[in-house]
Amino acid sequence: MIMNKYLDVNPEVAAAIREGKPVVALESTIISHGMPYPQNVETALAVERIIREQGAVPATIAIIGGRLKAGLTAEEIEYFGKKGQAIHKASRRDLAVLCARGEDGATTVTTTMIIAHMAGI
């Protein structure tokens, strides 16, 4: 894991990484921009449940309040779902600005890969 003062790794995800368990990184744009509320939240939670049923740990990746998040809580997924398209769609170029401004960002595939790598996924 790359130590970064802006990175928060969910405790369940951190434990899975330490123990060598499989972790699946998921982008968050589908939650904020892909579907309307509440279907977006229901779908995101269902995908996480299916991943757990298959023996892996889900790590939905997002930026909340300028913090890079590797693994969201159900409450954070709900927050993202309710805010919807009011959340910035965050690509690589947006990371520094969102962190500096303390804003939220829904990760694209590229940004998801960057944050997942930082977290050791």
What function would you assign to each model-found segment?
Residues V9, T108-V109:
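Amphipathic coiled-coil/heptad-repeat helices and related helical stalk/stem segments
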Residues S28, H33-M35, Q39-L98:
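Glycine-rich nucleotide/cofactor/substrate-binding loop typically near the N-terminus or early
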Residues V97-R101, A119-I121:
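A short, small-residue-rich loop immediately preceding and capping a beta-strand
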Residues V109-I121:
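Internal, conserved structured core segments that host functional sites
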Residues M1-Q54, M118:
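N-terminal glycine-/serine-/threonine-rich phosphate-binding loop
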Residues R101-T108:
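Active-site nucleophile and cofactor-binding loops and adjacent substrate-binding regions
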